């Protein structure tokens, strides 16, 4: 399928922001920190604790306009990190503690637990941006 453009000689696809399929706001559980979590599927594997090595697939969007800013699936490479060591944004360390391998979840993270007033211009994340992630926990070790 081709997307029409203003000039017949230029065949460039239009840029479209597509809202991710997310649970209704009421389905999310609030944590005391302000992170909100919705479990799409409970995993049956090993449970994560501080210091666990996690391998995940994720997609991240700006909460304001649903613009995707990053995806391990698009990179075709899972992301690995050690939980609770400050190697990821604080919202991830909070949300991914005590989850089991195989879990699929959605996470809403307030700016203060993401990139805060700094933002990350190279990724298209403005200052004080709330973020939304879909995360699948592939491995806990």
Can you say where each PLM-predicted feature lies in the sequence?
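Cross-family detector of peptidyl-prolyl cis-trans isomerase
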Residues: 1-141
């Amino acid at each position: 399928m081709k997307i029409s453009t203003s000039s017949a000689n230029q065949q460039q696809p239009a840029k479209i922001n597509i809202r991710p399929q997310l649970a209704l706001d009421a389905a999310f559980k609030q944590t005391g920190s302000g992170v909100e979590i919705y479990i799409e599927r409970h995993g049956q594997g090993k449970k994560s604790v501080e210091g666990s090595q996690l391998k995940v697939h994720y997609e991240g969007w700006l909460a304001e306009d649903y613009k995707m800013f990053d995806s391990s699936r698009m990179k075709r490479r899972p992301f690995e990190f050690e939980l609770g060591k400050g190697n990821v944004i604080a919202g991830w360390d909070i949300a991914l503690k005590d989850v089991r391998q195989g879990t699929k979840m959605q996470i809403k993270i307030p700016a203060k637990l993401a990139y805060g007033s700094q933002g990350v211009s190279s990724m298209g994340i403005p200052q004080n941006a709330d973020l939304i992630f879909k995360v699948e926990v592939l491995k806990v070790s």
